[in-house]
Regions:
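A structural boundary/capping signal
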Residues: 1-170
Length: 170
């Protein structure tokens, strides 16, 4: 069933792909690899795991509208990270390269979403200063965010605009 597809994609990709930074793999600070590139190299960073899981689940018949790449801040590890979110009728599930167990987004409160995209749709997440009310848009540039588990969040910068990131996973 559906849960089996999610578990299979998460466990297979986590077991098949070795974590390696973009600098080590591609000689670049940040590179969003296609699923084929990640498989060919047998390695990738967190967003490469998420892209490969997304591609695998699409091939298994999971609707694209249910699959979302989420770039977030992991407040417990003080870094930026990327995961695959899966929207279900029972809430949002997170497929993560740091754990084989699939978790509900509510089970990972240290993950603060920054931006996400699914197909041709994209979102910027956040709250207004001094408020817990989510905002719809942001004036904050996303050009300084690059998910990578091995680099502390304050030192990150991204080398691709969101439109190019979306194009690389389609």
């Amino acid at each position: 069933g559906f849960a089996g597809k999610l578990a299979t994609a998460n466990i297979v990709v986590n077991g098949l792909i070795k974590y390696r930074s973009d600098q080590e793999t591609y000689g670049r600070f940040d590179y969003w690899a296609t699923a084929a590139e990640t498989i060919a190299r047998g390695a990738g960073d967190c967003e490469d795991f998420a892209i490969l899981k997304q591609t695998m689940l699409r091939a298994m018949g999971v609707p694209d509208k249910s699959l979302t790449i989420i770039v977030l801040r992991d407040n417990s590890r003080d870094l930026y990270h990327a995961v695959l979110g899966v929207s279900t009728n029972q809430g949002n599930l997170i497929l993560d390269n740091v754990r084989d167990q699939i978790a509900s987004d509510t089970q990972i409160p240290q993950y603060q979403p920054l931006f996400s995209f699914s197909g041709s749709r994209s979102w910027i997440h956040g709250t207004r200063k001094g408020s817990s009310t989510p905002i719809e848009t942001s004036q904050q540039p996303t050009a300084k965010i690059a998910p990578d588990e091995s680099i502390p969040a304050p030192a990150l910068s991204i080398s691709l605009p969101l439109s190019e990131l979306r194009a690389s996973i389609q």
